[in-house]
Amino acid sequence: MHFDYIIIGAGSAGNVLATRLTEDSDTTVLLLEAGGPDYRADFRTQMPAALAFPLQGKRYNWAYETEPEPHMNYRRMECGRGKGLGGSSLINGMCYIRGNAMDLDNWAQEPGLEHWSYLNCLPYYRKAETRDIGPNDYHGGDGPVSVATPKHNNNPLFHAMIEAGVQAGYPRTDDLNGYQQEGFGPMDRTVTPQGRRASTARGYLDQAKGRPNLTIITHALTDHILFEGKKASGVEWLEGDSTIPTRAMARKEVLLCAGAIASPQILQRSGVGDASLLKAFDIPLVHHLPGVGENLQDHLEMYLQYECKEPVSLYPALQWWNQPKIGAEWLFGGTGVGASNHFEAGGFIRSSEAFSWPNIQYHFLPVAINYNGSNAVKEHGFQCHVGSMRSPSRGHVHIKSRDPREHPAILFNYMSTGQDWQEFRDAIRITREIINQPALDKYRGREISPGITCQTDEQLDAFVRDHAETAFHPCGTCKMGYDEMAVVDGEGRVHGVENLRVVDASIMPQIITGNLNATTIMIGEKMADAIRGREPLAKSTASYYVAGDAPVRQPPLR
């Protein structure tokens, strides 16, 4: 089998590449996916409110676990990644958050990455998006990703939480992806007008899968990339439970889009990585690249949970006797409780003047429950998810064997610096100040978690060690750049070899301020033009907010 391009991983970036490359009818593409189809009849991946379900099994989730995390009481922590057409866009929380303009401007300060500035990238965010209230300078109107905005008649807790953030002295913003990210405001979501999850399988592959020049193979677990000398020439994979590899050859390039955990793992198994690690597993060295699998970053977050005095939370929706009606309303009308991810309000703030752009993110949820659907509080409640955005902690992903079915050793090294601890203490204390504002007076009951007895630095630190969880945003393990730990150049080409690119969240040099999915899709769009040899889209002329000397906050109301 010969193809022009072989794409490994039909996820948030891989599906973008498969769709854009096959727009050229004389270009043939093979798309390999280790998981299965995105079964449209399975409400678990299609109903936005069911977002906790795909995380609970292994049909759609790789369900990786970390090594014992040394600063987190040696807990083995969850590291869920999407498996199946759509990748992590099939199982994520559907928050459409792009990050801060300064994140990209920060990447672009590195020599060779100047074309990754915010204004260079904004046209690609717009190209990917169709926003339900129409396009403007920041948003698209005819892209493959459906974005839904919160409506005025949604849960009153969303409005109260935004007001409370403003009353606490922080800015208000009407669009967290627009002119100004900093502040509290409504949060967009990747949901279609019919109330379905807008994964990249739905948005991109649906328009491409009928093309004769695109071949999609599911249940195809990539073993390794084939090389002729230093030139990537093809891919070997295992289908289903088979132990006999299948292979295909690439006339032009192999495009690795397996994500921040699997992409470095595949490179290492293929002979590209740190020579000493590969030698330990008798893997023939193709190219010594010490940065492969290093620079691992993530967002850590925790929940502050409160009793709700008014019966307006989502608690009734968790009762089995209410669920048939909710399901029917969603299935037949695409409306109701089932049609939202319920992260419809949030915010970004600076916890101190030391930060030039926000370092803390909030998601608000009008129910008290764990992200994966466990430990629901048996009463009306609400919660704030809060966490730091650009932790200095760095981890790694290392293979444990040559077996593609064995998970790698993953260590995030969470909370390994003093900055991490200070940010989380500040975040908890600021959250309590926000919750104490007048806007929440009629709703706010007792603090369920961590509880008002948790006050000192030592008590807060112990709570974080015991209860903080991943926000499921791993990145950075094949970083872009030109220093000795960089893995790819500014076009995603792997240093030291030919005809091989990495295009996914692993190439982010530094994690962004917010959820990763929208930016991973943008990376796919931008790289697709580079691979096709097309002129980049014209740089945007939109203005954007830079805090400069603006104070972190105004005096709070209370």
From Swiss-Prot:
Q: Which UniProt keywords apply?
A: FAD, Flavoprotein, NAD, Oxidoreductase
| E.C. numbers | 1.1.99.1, 1.2.1.8
Kindly give the InterPro entries that the UniProt entry links to this protein: BetA, FAD/NAD-bd_sf, GMC_OxRdtase, GMC_OxRdtase_N, GMC_OxRtase_C
What are its GO biological-process terms? glycine betaine biosynthetic process from choline
Q: Where is the active site?
A: H473 (proton acceptor)
Pathway stated in the Swiss-Prot or TrEMBL entry: Amine and polyamine biosynthesis; betaine biosynthesis via choline pathway; betaine aldehyde from choline (cytochrome c reductase route): step 1/1
According to UniProt, the reaction catalysed is: choline + A = betaine aldehyde + AH2; betaine aldehyde + NAD(+) + H2O = glycine betaine + NADH + 2 H(+)
Q: Where does FAD bind?
A: 4-33
Name the coenzymes or cofactors required: FAD
In the UniProt record, does the keyword Oxidoreductase occur? yes
Q: Which SUPFAM superfamilies does the entry link to? A: FAD-linked reductases, C-terminal domain (SSF54373), FAD/NAD(P)-binding domain (SSF51905)
What the entry lists under HAMAP family is as follows:
Choline_dehydrogen
Function (record text): Involved in the biosynthesis of the osmoprotectant glycine betaine. Catalyzes the oxidation of choline to betaine aldehyde and betaine aldehyde to glycine betaine at the same rate.
**What family does the entry list?**
Belongs to the GMC oxidoreductase family.
This chain belongs to the protein called Oxygen-dependent choline dehydrogenase
